[in-house]
Amino acid sequence: MRCAPTAGAALVLCAATAGLLSAQGRPAQPEPPRFASWDEMNLLAHGLLQLGHGLREHVERTRGQLGALERRMAACGNACQGPKGKDAPFKDSEDRVPEGQTPETLQSLQTQLKAQNSKIQQLFQKVAQQQRYLSKQNLRIQNLQSQIDLLAPTHLDNGVDKTSRGKRLPKMTQLIGLTPNATHLHRPPRDCQELFQEGERHSGLFQIQPLGSPPFLVNCEMTSDGGWTVIQRRLNGSVDFNQSWEAYKDGFGDPQGEFWLGLEKMHSITGNRGSQLAVQLQDWDGNAKLLQFPIHLGGEDTAYSLQLTEPTANELGATNVSPNGLSLPFSTWDQDHDLRGDLNCAKSLSGGWWFGTCSHSNLNGQYFHSIPRQRQERKKGIFWKTWKGRYYPLQATTLLIQPMEATAAS
Protein backbone atom coordinates (compact mmCIF):
# COMPACT_ATOMS: atom_id res chain seq x y z
CA MET A 1 0.00 0.00 0.00
CA ARG A 2 1.45 3.40 -1.02
CA CYS A 3 1.07 6.24 1.50
CA ALA A 4 2.00 9.84 0.70
CA PRO A 5 4.02 11.66 3.37
CA THR A 6 1.60 13.63 5.51
CA ALA A 7 1.25 14.50 9.19
CA GLY A 8 2.35 12.02 11.87
CA ALA A 9 -1.19 10.94 12.65
CA ALA A 10 -1.76 10.26 8.94
CA LEU A 11 1.27 7.92 8.93
CA VAL A 12 -0.26 6.05 11.85
CA LEU A 13 -3.50 5.93 9.90
CA CYS A 14 -1.78 4.56 6.81
CA ALA A 15 -0.10 1.85 8.87
CA ALA A 16 -3.34 0.91 10.56
CA THR A 17 -5.22 0.94 7.24
CA ALA A 18 -2.54 -1.16 5.57
CA GLY A 19 -2.86 -3.70 8.35
CA LEU A 20 -6.60 -3.85 7.94
CA LEU A 21 -6.38 -4.19 4.14
CA SER A 22 -3.70 -6.85 4.27
CA ALA A 23 -5.83 -8.88 6.67
CA GLN A 24 -8.72 -9.03 4.22
CA GLY A 25 -8.94 -12.14 2.08
CA ARG A 26 -6.53 -14.18 4.24
CA PRO A 27 -7.78 -17.20 6.15
CA ALA A 28 -8.06 -16.78 9.91
CA GLN A 29 -4.84 -17.64 11.75
CA PRO A 30 -5.00 -20.12 14.60
CA GLU A 31 -3.30 -17.78 17.09
CA PRO A 32 -5.62 -15.61 19.20
CA PRO A 33 -6.56 -12.22 17.65
CA ARG A 34 -4.82 -9.07 18.73
CA PHE A 35 -7.36 -6.60 20.03
CA ALA A 36 -7.00 -2.91 19.29
CA SER A 37 -7.31 -0.71 22.33
CA TRP A 38 -9.84 2.06 22.66
CA ASP A 39 -6.91 4.55 22.55
CA GLU A 40 -5.80 3.00 19.26
CA MET A 41 -9.31 3.36 17.89
CA ASN A 42 -9.30 7.01 18.95
CA LEU A 43 -5.89 7.45 17.32
CA LEU A 44 -7.20 5.83 14.13
CA ALA A 45 -10.21 8.14 14.03
CA HIS A 46 -8.00 11.14 14.87
CA GLY A 47 -5.62 10.15 12.10
CA LEU A 48 -8.49 9.94 9.63
CA LEU A 49 -9.60 13.42 10.58
CA GLN A 50 -6.06 14.80 10.35
CA LEU A 51 -5.56 13.18 6.96
CA GLY A 52 -8.83 14.67 5.75
CA HIS A 53 -7.78 18.12 6.99
CA GLY A 54 -4.36 17.71 5.39
CA LEU A 55 -5.86 16.73 2.04
CA ARG A 56 -8.24 19.66 2.16
CA GLU A 57 -5.38 22.08 2.96
CA HIS A 58 -3.43 20.65 0.04
CA VAL A 59 -6.45 21.15 -2.21
CA GLU A 60 -6.68 24.78 -1.09
CA ARG A 61 -2.99 25.35 -1.79
CA THR A 62 -3.39 23.74 -5.21
CA ARG A 63 -6.36 25.94 -5.92
CA GLY A 64 -4.21 28.97 -5.09
CA GLN A 65 -1.57 27.80 -7.53
CA LEU A 66 -4.26 27.18 -10.12
CA GLY A 67 -5.56 30.71 -9.63
CA ALA A 68 -2.08 32.10 -10.20
CA LEU A 69 -1.79 30.11 -13.43
CA GLU A 70 -5.17 31.36 -14.58
CA ARG A 71 -4.11 34.95 -13.93
CA ARG A 72 -0.95 34.40 -15.93
CA MET A 73 -2.98 32.98 -18.79
CA ALA A 74 -5.42 35.86 -18.59
CA ALA A 75 -2.49 38.17 -19.16
CA CYS A 76 -2.03 36.51 -22.52
CA GLY A 77 -5.39 37.88 -23.62
CA ASN A 78 -6.94 36.61 -26.79
CA ALA A 79 -3.56 35.34 -27.90
CA CYS A 80 -4.18 32.22 -25.79
CA GLN A 81 -6.94 31.26 -28.24
CA GLY A 82 -4.65 31.48 -31.28
CA PRO A 83 -5.38 33.29 -34.60
CA LYS A 84 -8.94 33.07 -35.96
CA GLY A 85 -7.69 32.31 -39.46
CA LYS A 86 -4.70 30.53 -40.84
CA ASP A 87 -2.87 33.75 -41.61
CA ALA A 88 -5.00 36.21 -39.64
CA PRO A 89 -2.93 38.90 -37.93
CA PHE A 90 -3.61 40.02 -34.37
CA LYS A 91 -6.31 42.70 -34.22
CA ASP A 92 -4.26 45.15 -32.19
CA SER A 93 -1.50 45.39 -29.66
CA GLU A 94 -3.79 44.00 -26.92
CA ASP A 95 -4.04 40.71 -28.83
CA ARG A 96 -0.32 40.27 -29.00
CA VAL A 97 1.56 37.87 -26.77
CA PRO A 98 2.93 39.85 -23.84
CA GLU A 99 6.59 40.71 -23.95
CA GLY A 100 8.71 37.81 -22.84
CA GLN A 101 5.91 35.27 -23.55
CA THR A 102 6.11 32.79 -26.42
CA PRO A 103 3.70 30.15 -27.74
CA GLU A 104 5.90 27.61 -26.02
CA THR A 105 5.30 29.42 -22.70
CA LEU A 106 1.55 29.33 -23.28
CA GLN A 107 1.71 25.64 -24.07
CA SER A 108 3.67 25.08 -20.85
CA LEU A 109 1.07 26.99 -18.84
CA GLN A 110 -1.73 24.94 -20.35
CA THR A 111 0.14 21.74 -19.54
CA GLN A 112 0.64 22.87 -15.94
CA LEU A 113 -3.03 23.81 -15.71
CA LYS A 114 -4.12 20.36 -16.86
CA ALA A 115 -1.71 18.72 -14.44
CA GLN A 116 -3.02 20.80 -11.54
CA ASN A 117 -6.61 19.97 -12.49
CA SER A 118 -5.71 16.30 -12.52
CA LYS A 119 -4.08 16.56 -9.08
CA ILE A 120 -7.13 18.33 -7.68
CA GLN A 121 -9.42 15.61 -8.97
CA GLN A 122 -7.19 12.95 -7.44
CA LEU A 123 -7.16 14.78 -4.10
CA PHE A 124 -10.93 15.10 -4.11
CA GLN A 125 -11.18 11.38 -4.78
CA LYS A 126 -8.82 10.64 -1.87
CA VAL A 127 -10.80 12.91 0.46
CA ALA A 128 -14.06 11.24 -0.55
CA GLN A 129 -12.46 7.80 -0.10
CA GLN A 130 -11.18 8.67 3.38
CA GLN A 131 -14.57 10.12 4.35
CA ARG A 132 -16.27 6.90 3.26
CA TYR A 133 -13.72 4.89 5.21
CA LEU A 134 -14.25 7.06 8.30
CA SER A 135 -18.02 6.62 7.99
CA LYS A 136 -17.58 2.85 7.81
CA GLN A 137 -15.35 2.92 10.88
CA ASN A 138 -17.93 4.97 12.79
CA LEU A 139 -20.63 2.53 11.75
CA ARG A 140 -18.46 -0.37 12.85
CA ILE A 141 -17.89 1.24 16.24
CA GLN A 142 -21.65 1.70 16.64
CA ASN A 143 -22.25 -1.94 15.71
CA LEU A 144 -19.61 -3.07 18.17
CA GLN A 145 -21.19 -0.94 20.89
CA SER A 146 -24.49 -2.70 20.20
CA GLN A 147 -22.74 -6.06 20.40
CA ILE A 148 -21.14 -5.20 23.74
CA ASP A 149 -24.62 -4.43 25.08
CA LEU A 150 -25.59 -7.98 24.11
CA LEU A 151 -22.38 -9.50 25.43
CA ALA A 152 -22.39 -7.59 28.73
CA PRO A 153 -23.01 -9.93 31.65
CA THR A 154 -26.65 -9.83 32.67
CA HIS A 155 -25.69 -9.80 36.30
CA LEU A 156 -23.57 -7.55 38.50
CA ASP A 157 -24.26 -8.45 42.12
CA ASN A 158 -24.18 -5.87 44.87
CA GLY A 159 -21.50 -7.72 46.83
CA VAL A 160 -18.63 -7.43 44.34
CA ASP A 161 -16.17 -4.57 44.62
CA LYS A 162 -15.38 -2.14 41.82
CA THR A 163 -12.30 -4.07 40.72
CA SER A 164 -14.09 -7.38 40.30
CA ARG A 165 -17.08 -5.62 38.73
CA GLY A 166 -14.76 -4.15 36.12
CA LYS A 167 -13.62 -7.66 35.25
CA ARG A 168 -17.21 -8.76 34.69
CA LEU A 169 -17.87 -6.09 32.05
CA PRO A 170 -16.25 -6.34 28.59
CA LYS A 171 -13.59 -3.69 28.05
CA MET A 172 -13.30 -1.57 24.94
CA THR A 173 -10.05 -3.40 24.15
CA GLN A 174 -12.16 -6.46 23.32
CA LEU A 175 -14.44 -4.73 20.83
CA ILE A 176 -12.42 -5.17 17.66
CA GLY A 177 -12.20 -8.93 18.19
CA LEU A 178 -15.96 -9.50 18.33
CA THR A 179 -17.37 -11.80 15.69
CA PRO A 180 -20.64 -11.55 13.72
CA ASN A 181 -21.91 -14.54 15.72
CA ALA A 182 -22.28 -12.21 18.72
CA THR A 183 -25.59 -10.97 17.31
CA HIS A 184 -27.07 -14.46 17.65
CA LEU A 185 -26.65 -14.69 21.42
CA HIS A 186 -29.57 -15.43 23.70
CA ARG A 187 -31.95 -12.48 24.10
CA PRO A 188 -31.86 -10.94 27.59
CA PRO A 189 -34.87 -11.56 29.87
CA ARG A 190 -37.92 -9.35 29.50
CA ASP A 191 -37.84 -8.16 33.11
CA CYS A 192 -36.53 -9.12 36.55
CA GLN A 193 -39.35 -11.61 37.08
CA GLU A 194 -38.41 -13.52 33.93
CA LEU A 195 -34.81 -13.52 35.16
CA PHE A 196 -36.05 -14.96 38.47
CA GLN A 197 -37.92 -17.68 36.56
CA GLU A 198 -34.67 -18.56 34.78
CA GLY A 199 -33.12 -19.36 38.17
CA GLU A 200 -31.42 -16.11 39.24
CA ARG A 201 -31.70 -15.52 43.00
CA HIS A 202 -29.21 -12.68 43.61
CA SER A 203 -30.19 -9.02 43.59
CA GLY A 204 -28.13 -6.56 41.55
CA LEU A 205 -27.73 -4.95 38.14
CA PHE A 206 -28.96 -6.96 35.18
CA GLN A 207 -29.55 -6.38 31.51
CA ILE A 208 -33.14 -6.84 30.35
CA GLN A 209 -34.89 -6.35 27.02
CA PRO A 210 -38.67 -5.83 27.08
CA LEU A 211 -40.59 -6.65 23.91
CA GLY A 212 -40.06 -4.02 21.23
CA SER A 213 -37.35 -2.25 23.23
CA PRO A 214 -33.54 -2.13 23.04
CA PRO A 215 -31.72 -3.75 26.00
CA PHE A 216 -30.91 -1.68 29.07
CA LEU A 217 -29.63 -2.15 32.63
CA VAL A 218 -31.98 -2.31 35.61
CA ASN A 219 -31.63 -2.95 39.32
CA CYS A 220 -33.39 -6.18 40.28
CA GLU A 221 -34.53 -7.12 43.78
CA MET A 222 -34.91 -10.88 44.13
CA THR A 223 -37.29 -11.90 46.93
CA SER A 224 -39.34 -14.92 47.90
CA ASP A 225 -42.15 -13.36 45.85
CA GLY A 226 -40.05 -13.29 42.67
CA GLY A 227 -38.07 -10.65 40.82
CA TRP A 228 -38.90 -6.97 41.20
CA THR A 229 -37.62 -4.20 38.90
CA VAL A 230 -36.56 -1.09 40.82
CA ILE A 231 -37.83 2.05 39.05
CA GLN A 232 -37.00 4.72 41.65
CA ARG A 233 -34.79 5.18 44.69
CA ARG A 234 -34.24 8.12 47.05
CA LEU A 235 -31.78 7.80 49.93
CA ASN A 236 -29.32 10.69 50.29
CA GLY A 237 -30.20 13.63 48.04
CA SER A 238 -27.23 13.05 45.72
CA VAL A 239 -29.42 13.46 42.60
CA ASP A 240 -31.59 16.46 41.71
CA PHE A 241 -35.11 15.19 40.95
CA ASN A 242 -36.48 18.57 39.85
CA GLN A 243 -36.05 17.58 36.20
CA SER A 244 -37.81 18.26 32.89
CA TRP A 245 -40.33 16.06 31.08
CA GLU A 246 -37.67 14.64 28.75
CA ALA A 247 -35.44 13.73 31.70
CA TYR A 248 -38.27 11.87 33.42
CA LYS A 249 -39.15 10.18 30.15
CA ASP A 250 -35.59 8.95 29.50
CA GLY A 251 -34.43 8.44 33.10
CA PHE A 252 -31.56 9.87 35.14
CA GLY A 253 -29.32 9.18 38.13
CA ASP A 254 -27.13 6.25 39.20
CA PRO A 255 -28.68 2.73 39.28
CA GLN A 256 -26.41 1.93 42.24
CA GLY A 257 -27.63 5.00 44.15
CA GLU A 258 -30.43 7.49 43.58
CA PHE A 259 -32.15 7.25 40.21
CA TRP A 260 -35.32 7.38 38.13
CA LEU A 261 -35.48 4.55 35.58
CA GLY A 262 -37.47 6.50 32.99
CA LEU A 263 -41.17 6.54 32.08
CA GLU A 264 -40.59 5.06 28.64
CA LYS A 265 -38.58 2.15 30.06
CA MET A 266 -41.24 1.57 32.73
CA HIS A 267 -43.92 1.50 30.04
CA SER A 268 -41.90 -0.95 27.92
CA ILE A 269 -41.56 -3.26 30.96
CA THR A 270 -45.24 -3.18 31.91
CA GLY A 271 -46.54 -3.11 28.32
CA ASN A 272 -50.21 -3.99 28.18
CA ARG A 273 -49.87 -6.25 31.21
CA GLY A 274 -51.18 -5.40 34.61
CA SER A 275 -48.41 -4.87 37.14
CA GLN A 276 -47.93 -4.71 40.87
CA LEU A 277 -46.37 -1.53 42.27
CA ALA A 278 -44.49 -1.80 45.56
CA VAL A 279 -43.84 1.42 47.51
CA GLN A 280 -41.19 1.27 50.25
CA LEU A 281 -41.14 4.27 52.61
CA GLN A 282 -38.84 5.13 55.52
CA ASP A 283 -39.04 7.96 58.07
CA TRP A 284 -36.25 9.62 60.06
CA ASP A 285 -36.75 7.32 63.06
CA GLY A 286 -35.98 4.18 61.06
CA ASN A 287 -39.63 3.14 60.71
CA ALA A 288 -40.59 1.55 57.39
CA LYS A 289 -43.82 1.15 55.47
CA LEU A 290 -44.57 -1.16 52.52
CA LEU A 291 -47.52 -0.57 50.19
CA GLN A 292 -48.49 -2.78 47.25
CA PHE A 293 -51.29 -2.23 44.75
CA PRO A 294 -52.12 -3.13 41.13
CA ILE A 295 -51.50 -0.61 38.35
CA HIS A 296 -51.51 -0.15 34.59
CA LEU A 297 -49.11 2.40 33.10
CA GLY A 298 -50.16 4.18 29.92
CA GLY A 299 -47.83 5.41 27.18
CA GLU A 300 -46.74 8.94 26.36
CA ASP A 301 -50.03 9.58 24.54
CA THR A 302 -51.72 9.34 27.96
CA ALA A 303 -48.97 11.37 29.71
CA TYR A 304 -47.84 8.03 31.20
CA SER A 305 -51.01 7.88 33.28
CA LEU A 306 -50.94 5.66 36.35
CA GLN A 307 -54.20 3.73 36.18
CA LEU A 308 -55.43 2.61 39.59
CA THR A 309 -58.32 0.77 41.21
CA GLU A 310 -60.08 1.41 44.51
CA PRO A 311 -59.14 2.11 47.25
CA THR A 312 -55.68 3.21 46.07
CA ALA A 313 -57.18 5.59 43.52
CA ASN A 314 -58.88 7.56 46.29
CA GLU A 315 -55.75 7.47 48.42
CA LEU A 316 -53.73 9.11 45.64
CA GLY A 317 -56.44 11.49 44.44
CA ALA A 318 -57.15 9.86 41.07
CA THR A 319 -60.41 11.02 39.46
CA ASN A 320 -59.90 10.64 35.70
CA VAL A 321 -61.79 7.66 34.29
CA SER A 322 -59.64 5.18 32.33
CA PRO A 323 -60.20 1.68 30.87
CA ASN A 324 -58.50 0.14 33.92
CA GLY A 325 -60.04 2.29 36.65
CA LEU A 326 -59.14 5.84 37.63
CA SER A 327 -55.96 7.45 36.33
CA LEU A 328 -53.33 9.99 37.32
CA PRO A 329 -51.27 11.59 34.50
CA PHE A 330 -47.61 12.35 35.10
CA SER A 331 -46.57 16.01 35.41
CA THR A 332 -43.35 18.04 35.45
CA TRP A 333 -42.67 21.76 35.68
CA ASP A 334 -42.61 22.02 31.86
CA GLN A 335 -45.49 19.56 31.17
CA ASP A 336 -48.50 20.31 33.39
CA HIS A 337 -50.96 17.39 33.38
CA ASP A 338 -52.10 17.42 37.01
CA LEU A 339 -55.74 17.65 38.10
CA ARG A 340 -55.46 21.21 39.45
CA GLY A 341 -56.73 23.76 36.97
CA ASP A 342 -55.40 26.76 38.92
CA LEU A 343 -51.92 25.46 39.79
CA ASN A 344 -48.91 23.61 38.39
CA CYS A 345 -48.16 21.11 41.15
CA ALA A 346 -44.62 20.40 39.91
CA LYS A 347 -43.75 24.11 40.01
CA SER A 348 -45.46 24.71 43.34
CA LEU A 349 -43.83 21.66 44.93
CA SER A 350 -40.78 20.06 43.29
CA GLY A 351 -39.95 17.18 40.96
CA GLY A 352 -42.12 15.21 38.54
CA TRP A 353 -44.89 12.95 39.80
CA TRP A 354 -48.44 11.61 39.41
CA PHE A 355 -49.67 14.57 41.44
CA GLY A 356 -53.46 14.48 41.34
CA THR A 357 -54.42 17.64 43.23
CA CYS A 358 -50.92 18.21 44.68
CA SER A 359 -51.69 17.11 48.23
CA HIS A 360 -51.74 13.28 48.25
CA SER A 361 -48.14 12.19 47.53
CA ASN A 362 -44.85 13.18 45.92
CA LEU A 363 -41.94 10.75 46.17
CA ASN A 364 -39.80 12.79 43.75
CA GLY A 365 -39.86 15.98 45.81
CA GLN A 366 -36.95 17.91 47.24
CA TYR A 367 -34.67 15.89 49.51
CA PHE A 368 -34.02 17.29 52.98
CA HIS A 369 -31.17 15.99 55.16
CA SER A 370 -33.18 17.02 58.19
CA ILE A 371 -36.78 18.10 58.70
CA PRO A 372 -37.15 21.85 57.98
CA ARG A 373 -38.89 24.00 60.55
CA GLN A 374 -40.94 25.99 58.06
CA ARG A 375 -44.11 24.28 56.89
CA GLN A 376 -43.97 26.08 53.54
CA GLU A 377 -40.57 24.50 52.92
CA ARG A 378 -41.57 21.04 54.16
CA LYS A 379 -44.40 20.80 51.62
CA LYS A 380 -41.81 20.63 48.82
CA GLY A 381 -40.27 17.49 50.26
CA ILE A 382 -40.87 13.75 49.77
CA PHE A 383 -44.22 12.81 51.31
CA TRP A 384 -47.00 10.21 51.38
CA LYS A 385 -50.03 11.79 53.03
CA THR A 386 -51.69 8.63 54.38
CA TRP A 387 -48.41 7.72 56.13
CA LYS A 388 -46.75 10.42 58.26
CA GLY A 389 -48.93 13.20 56.85
CA ARG A 390 -48.70 15.93 54.23
CA TYR A 391 -45.87 17.93 55.80
CA TYR A 392 -43.48 15.17 56.89
CA PRO A 393 -40.53 14.85 54.45
CA LEU A 394 -39.47 11.20 54.27
CA GLN A 395 -35.88 10.01 54.49
CA ALA A 396 -35.89 7.23 51.88
CA THR A 397 -38.17 5.69 49.25
CA THR A 398 -38.02 2.89 46.70
CA LEU A 399 -40.48 2.02 43.93
CA LEU A 400 -40.56 -1.46 42.37
CA ILE A 401 -42.76 -3.15 39.75
CA GLN A 402 -43.56 -6.77 38.95
CA PRO A 403 -45.99 -8.31 36.44
CA MET A 404 -49.33 -9.35 37.92
CA GLU A 405 -49.01 -12.97 36.79
CA ALA A 406 -46.05 -13.37 39.14
CA THR A 407 -48.19 -12.23 42.07
CA ALA A 408 -50.97 -14.60 41.06
CA ALA A 409 -48.54 -17.51 40.75
CA SER A 410 -47.09 -16.92 44.20
From Swiss-Prot:
Glycans are attached at residues 181, 236, 242. GO terms for biological process: angiogenesis; blood coagulation; cellular response to starvation; endothelial cell apoptotic process; lipid metabolic process; negative regulation of apoptotic process; negative regulation of endothelial cell apoptotic process; negative regulation of fatty acid biosynthetic process. N-glycosylated. Cleaved into a smaller N-terminal chain and a larger chain that contains the fibrinogen C-terminal domain; both cleaved and uncleaved forms are detected in the extracellular space. The cleaved form is not present within the cell. GO terms for cellular component: extracellular region; extracellular space. Residues 84-98 have a biased composition (Basic and acidic residues). Induction: Induced in interstitial capillaries in response to hind leg ischemia. Alterations in nutrition and leptin administration are found to modulate the expression in vivo. Detected in liver and kidney. Predominantly expressed in adipose tissue and is strongly up-regulated by fasting in white adipose tissue and liver. More abundant in areas of lower flow stress in the inner curvature compared to the outer curvature regions of the aorta (at protein level). It comes from the Eukaryota. It holds the Pfam family Fibrinogen_C. Keywords: Angiogenesis, Coiled coil, Disulfide bond, Extracellular matrix, Glycoprotein, Lipid metabolism, Secreted, Signal. The record marks 168-169 as: Cleavage. Disulfide bonds join 192-220, 345-358. Its main location: secreted. Upon heterologous expression under the control of the keratinocyte promoter in the skin, inhibits tumor-associated angiogenesis and tumor growth. In xenograft models, it inhibits both intra- and extravasation of tumor cells as well as vascular permeability leading to inhibition of metastases. Expression by tumor cells induces reorganization of the actin cytoskeleton through inhibition of actin stress fiber formation and vinculin localization at focal contacts. It might prevent the metastatic process by inhibiting vascular activity as well as tumor cell motility and invasiveness. Mediates inactivation of the lipoprotein lipase LPL, and thereby plays a role in the regulation of triglyceride clearance from the blood serum and in lipid metabolism. May also play a role in regulating glucose homeostasis and insulin sensitivity. Inhibits proliferation, migration, and tubule formation of endothelial cells and reduces vascular leakage. Homooligomer; disulfide-linked via Cys residues in the N-terminal part of the protein. The homooligomer undergoes proteolytic processing to release the ANGPTL4 C-terminal chain, which circulates as a monomer. The homooligomer unprocessed form is able to interact with the extracellular matrix. This is Angiopoietin-related protein 4. It comes from Mus musculus (Mouse). The lineage of its organism: Eukaryota, Metazoa, Chordata, Craniata, Vertebrata.
